[in-house]
Amino acid sequence: MKTRIAINGFGRIGRNLFRLLLNHPSIEVIVINDIADKKTMAHLVKYDSIHGVLPSTVSDDEKGILVDGKHFLFFHEKSISNLDWKSLDIDYVVESTGKHKTFEELNAHIIAGAKKVILSAPSEVDTIKTVVLGVNDSILDGTETIISNASCTTNNAAPMIKVINELCGIEQAYITTIHSYTTDQSLHDQPHKDLRRARGASQSIVPTTTGAAKALTKIFPEFDGKIGGCGIRVPVPDGSLTDITFNVKRAVTINEINAAFKIAAETNLKGILDYTEDPIVSVDVIGNKNSCIFDAQLTSVIDKMVKVVGWYDNEIGYSSRIIDLILLTKK
């Protein structure tokens, strides 16, 4: 019997997750909830400016949307309390609105009848476990009803931190995410609480903050106070990278670092960490389901200072980890 899920919030992550789950052998989407109208959302499922045209027939009716004749319910509820997940026998709700991050808000899905909730963002509270697959998923014991899948950048950076720490130990780290623009920004100048993000997304390189540094200390509590970071938004719609500079405990060579990443990509982090020695650019990682594509050409070392770079499709890579987290926790 397939695992039944609901997607609450049908933006970039919600729609990419939906596309990835079409024809999945063990997970099926039952219902979508979003305040936008069904006709528009059906169109955006079919036609995606980044990931292309879905090779399926997509339409809508009075109760939902259809893909190749398969029907998916579509609700328009603003309040989680108005959703009846129990009557639909929902196993998982993927909370991807970007609005609900507290325990009380997320637990409303459990009260509504869902068995588990996956949050597609870092949690704002310590009572919800934040997980990066391949790095700290051993903290899960099966009793959790709400789990945070962290952020796309956290999923990208954490495998690199893991490999470097196991290789030579870490004293401090600073991450810089060179990130594609997102729907949090506007095409033209618009008011925003972050005055840099108030500027047109397609016109400038935009220095900003990143929540990944804080989230990473939930993944690696031993590095609390030792990881900093910032974000640089750039005028591309998808495809990002994280540049991490480490102060390490012992001197290490470029060859040692690259060899460690190559081994990890082929063994314990396979499917999460990819490895390349090719001179790639951001467009080359679009569609890659790995959390991190390690760029061996960009590794550099000065004594005990190490710099590594990992690319990521901040949409598809992250959405793929949500699926993997469901598969892991439904066992």
Predicted regions and their residues:
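N-terminal Rossmann-like NAD(P) cofactor-binding subdomain of oxidoreductases
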Residues: 1-198, 300, 322-324
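Short clusters of hydrophobic/aromatic residues that line enzyme substrate/ligand-binding pockets
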Residues: 65, 131-133, 146, 188, ...
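Short, solvent-exposed beta-strand edge segments and adjacent coil->beta transition regions
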Residues: 143-144, 200-202, 239-243, 305-307
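Hydrophobic alpha-helical scaffolding
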Residues: 150-151, 205-207, 247, 312
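Generic recognition of short, well-ordered alpha-helical interface segments
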Residues: 155, 159, 207, 211-215, ...
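Acidic, glycine-rich segments within the central catalytic cores of soluble metabolic enzymes
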Residues: 166, 170-237
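C-terminal active-site/capping subdomain that shapes the small-molecule cofactor and substrate pocket
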Residues: 229, 241, 245-331
